Regions:
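Short, Lys/Arg-rich, polar N-terminal cytosolic tail immediately upstream
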Residues: 1-11
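Central hydrophobic cores of alpha-helical transmembrane segments in multi-pass inner-membrane proteins
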Residues: 66, 87-99, 118-121
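Perimembrane helix-loop-helix junctions
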Residues: 178-194
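Membrane-interface micro-motifs in multi-pass membrane enzymes
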Residues: 58, 62, 86, 107-151, ...
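Membrane-interface transmembrane helices that cradle and orient dolichyl/undecaprenyl
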Residues: 143-157, 189-193
Length: 194
């Protein structure tokens, strides 16, 4: 059995819980927008990213968005698929937060999932910029993964740098997710050593 399979078997229950909690919160909070073609704002001009989207994203400094689109979803804006990808990335992020901070309570884990899914950036993007929702949530997952690697492995900050660069290449303000989680980790370390 490989290292990845062993890790999965050890954490299978929490992986399923994280994804179930994210999916339930996500459908309750944003199901209508994800299952409806109500395009607004940039979603109209980026319905087909080949027309305006890729060049515009690169000019804004979001240099990895075209690569992300080609790898994961293509150029068309399909709200249901974008919604599923977004929930997938947030599910991974929630699981990594649970492992980073060693959360063992289902109640706390469910609340963490609710915070990730219902926070204002997710809500506003779902309502107005659904064309960017999945790639931005991929950036959030990269930001969380960087903190997870930094906290769990002695040299984890090295690959963590690549994940921070990935988050910055998707959307620059996602760096705040990394900064916030690092601050929480530092505060918890200080409190543990009092």
């Amino acid at each position: 059995m490989t290292w990845l399979q062993e890790t999965y078997e050890r954490n299978k229950r929490w992986v399923y819980f994280a994804f179930a909690a994210v999916f339930i919160w996500g459908m309750a909070a944003h199901g209508y927008a994800m299952l409806d073609n109500s395009f607004t704002h940039d979603s109209l001009s980026e319905f087909d990213a080949n027309i305006f989207g890729d060049g515009h994203k690169i000019m804004l400094g979001r240099i990895l968005v075209p690569t992300y689109r080609q790898l994961f979803r293509g150029d068309l804006t399909m709200p249901w698929f974008i919604g599923l990808l977004s929930l997938l990335w947030i599910g991974i992020a929630v699981f990594l937060v649970m492992k980073t901070f060693r959360i063992e309570s289902k109640l706390i884990a469910g609340l963490v999932a609710g915070v990730f899914v219902a926070y204002i950036s997710f809500s506003s993007m779902t309502a107005t910029y659904i064309n960017d929702l999945d790639n931005n949530m991929f950036g959030v997952m990269c930001a969380v993964c960087a903190v997870f690697l930094w906290r769990r492995f002695s040299w984890g900050w090295l690959p963590g740098i690549a994940f921070v660069i990935g988050a910055l290449g998707i959307y620059q303000s996602i760096i705040l997710v990394t900064v916030t989680l690092v601050m929480i980790a530092c505060i918890l370390d200080i409190l543990a050593n009092l």
